[in-house]
Amino acid sequence: MKITMQIKLQPTKEETVLLDFTMQEYISLVNDILDYAIASDIMPKLTSKTMIAPLPSALKAQCYMDAKSIYGNTLKHKSRMPVLKKPVAIWNNQNYTIDDGYVAFPLFVNNKTTKTKISAVVPQRVLDIAATHKLGTLRITKKGNKYIAQIAYETAESAAKTSGNVMGVDLGIKCPAVAVTNNGKTKFYGNGRQNKQKRRKFAAKRKRLGKAKKLKAIKKSHNKEQRWMADQDHKISRAIVNDAIANDVKTIKLEELSGIRQSARTSRKNNHSLHSWSFYRLAKFIEYKAGLAGIEVVYVNPAYTSQICPCCGKRNHANDRNYVCSCGYHTHRDRLGAVNILTA
């Protein structure tokens, strides 16, 4: 399984100029190679010597590989040839090093290639991974005014468990996730009300900024909200998988992603929250973390999971947060969904 870790760079003012220049020249060279390939209807054979650009040879070679990959994929899928715009530069794993406090890679300085150490926040976890795993490419990108180093590495998934318990997980708005295991354990994850209040603050701030026509500030606020949402999903998915491991779970059952928005229970005032929160992202976070632990993830049909009584099969509508069936069964409505997913 391929995983990408991120490192926040802390370049000096002079180094930010170098990074901006390098990233712009990188995408310009890739676009130039693609333009040539389109015009001649064939991918040209180029070397770092024949590619004219103020970039280190390693970066030129990577530019050619990227252009070749884009050109081949575009022909294969018969799609429109893209034009790269987002600043980025990529180094292969032989041309960079990571150490405590910095990331070093070649840059073109004063008309010559110089391996440059850029100050960075490098967590111990990243150093441990670098020492024990084969690293892939280094990708430098810019998000707002921040420079991020993205490093890919391969890790083996744990062998799939052949025996163990089953966990059903229901995703929602008021309660982000509820998990029920076949050994009788139930747990609620996240705080939907707190999430809603937090996102209302983001929306109110953007409304004020909109009236002041501060477009850059609006975009910054939106990006900050998205990062916060992703962080919440990471924490919830980690907690779910940790509990699955603790309960010897071999299979986690989730709702099919295509129907989750239709089946989710919500009021009109929660419609915005429903359609802006990414159930897909949370499900995928659970899936990849579970895969690393050797836990299988299965998707089930979500139809009527919030209405069917697991005891008698009768369909009922919950009253507020309580679900009561005429057969005598009663439970929390969010837990009901997880129970029905578990037994689906």
Task: Report the location of each language-model feature.
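Nucleic-acid substrate recognition interfaces
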Residues: 1-344
